[in-house]
Amino acid sequence: VLKGDRDSVELRRAREVRPILDDIDLLLDLHTMQHLAPPLMMSGRLAKGKDLACKVGVPERIVGDSGHAAGRRMRDYGGFDDPSSTKAALMIECGQHWKEASGLLAKESTVRFLEAMGTLEPELLELLENLYVPPSAQQLFNVRETVTITQETFTFVENFVGGEIIRKAGTLIGH
């Protein structure tokens, strides 16, 4: 897609960012959401992403998946999704666009990411330690199957808002 003739703001931005992604070893990609759902960290399909997510420690939910049906995310690019590479990446959905807590989580996760990488001076860590409460125990979820809605007549059987956990395989969620 990036080498093709198509043009859009997103494609131009992706073409500009790609050389940076080729050069870096670690990536923290911060986002906010438009729908009400709990914050979550997308760790990718590999153990190294899950390990990095656990070192960062926030948010509580870690979701491992094989990527997005509409195209690769930055955290799925190149060495980040290569089990033989030491490169690792995380994407965090910090919460809703309009909520102050989303910005606070973005800042906290950045500090914790830098701390996990050993890039913060001990004096700074001491100052920052008092700003954040110890994180809650994290929960790891693995997406077993990605389903893409292909018909305009699709409807959910319940009012799902995001972050629901479907505990039993084969549970009807829509038709």
What residues fall within each predicted segment?
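Structured catalytic-domain cores with a bias toward divalent-metal coordination
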Residues: 1-175
